Amino acid sequence: MRRFIAGLVAVIAAAGFTAAGAQDKKTTRISIGTGGTGGVYYPLGGGLAAMLSKYVPGVEATAEVTAGSIANLQLIGGGKSEVGFTMADAAWDAVNGFDKFTGRKVALRTLVVFYPNRMHVVTVEGSGINSMKDLKGKRVSTGAPVSGTEVTAMRLIEAFGMDPNKDMTRERLSVAESVSALKDGKIDALFWVGGVPTPSITDLAATPGKTIKLIDHGDGAENMRKKFGPIYVKNKILANAYPGETRDTTNIDVWNLLVVPADADDNLVYQITKLMFEKKDELVRVHKDAGFLELANQATGASPIPFHPGAARYLKERGITVNVK
C-alpha cells in the first residue's frame, strides 16, 4: 500500500483533469473492486477506471470482477485493492468486526456516498410465491458467497420470522447465475441488491415465456432497523422499472459507498473525489444510477463510517461538512 501511495501521489501531484499522455511517467496501476458482470458495480467501476486512466497522467486503473461488497472489503483489508464498491451495511460490519468480519476488522474510510441499492426479491408467474412468507419450502438464491446481497438477504429473511437455512433450500449464486437458474426452473426466487434497472433482472424480464414478479418486502425494514440500526430504509421500486412488472413494489434500500483504506494518501483521495464530482456526467452515461452522486447526499448520514480526510477536504471546498471521526 505504501509503495502504491508513493507512486500515485508522484504522478497526480500536478495533475488537473487533462487527458493522460505523458510517456515519461511510470505507469501506476489501481485496482477497483466491483462485483459480477451482471450487476451495476462492474460497469460503474469500469467507467471510473476509464476516467482515472484518462485524466490522471501515468495512472492505469482496472475494474476487477469480484463477488461484491464483502470480497471488495477483504481485498482492501489484504492490501490487494485500492478502491472498493460496497454496501453500507457490509462496510459497517467490516470496520466493527461483525458477522463475516469477526476477528478481522478492516480500517476503511468513505470516499463517496454513491447511489441507493435496491433489494430485489424476484420470482416469476407460476411459482406460487406472492409474499415473503411464501418463500418457505422454496428453492431460493440468496446471492453469491461473500457478497453484500447475501448479508442483506439473510437479515431480511430473518426480519420476516424465517430461518434462511431451515425454512427454504438456499443456493448461493451470483445475480447472473441466479437469473439463469430461475429461467431454467432450478430455483423459485432470487435475492439481489443493486441499482434499478439491473441488467440481469432486465434480461430475465425480457425472456419469452417468463413474466417477472417482484415481491413486496418493505415492511421488513422496521425489524431490520431495530437490530442493525438506521442503515436500512423502506422505499419502493416503481412500476415498469422492469418489463412486465406493472405494480409499484415496496423494498429495502441501503446506500452504496466507494471506500478506501484508512491510511490512503489525502491527496490521492482528494483527486479521485474531485474527479468523480466534476466528471460525473461521464459516469451517468455508463449507468443512470450515477446520477445519485450528489453533494447533498454526502452529509445525510447514509454512510455509517467516517469520510476520508482527503474526500472531506474536497467536500468542504464545495460547502459540505461530513464526519471524519
Regions found by a protein language model. Give the residues of each.
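Surface-exposed aromatic
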Residues: A290-A302
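Pocket-flanking alpha-helical
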Residues: G46-A50, T62-G103, V121, A176-A181, ...
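Short, low-complexity disordered leader/linker segments with a strong preference
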Residues: M1-R29, K325
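Periplasmic-binding protein-like
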Residues: M276-L293
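C-terminal lobe and pocket-closing loops
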Residues: A206, T211-Q271, P306-F307, Y314, ...
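Bilobed "Venus flytrap"/periplasmic-binding protein-like clamshell domains
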Residues: R29-Y55, V59, N117-D184, G301, ...
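A structural signal for short loop-to-beta-strand junctions that line the ligand-binding cleft
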Residues: T102-F114, N240-T250
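Ligand-binding pocket segment of bilobal, Venus flytrap-like solute-binding proteins
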Residues: L73, E82-F85, M168-P230, A312
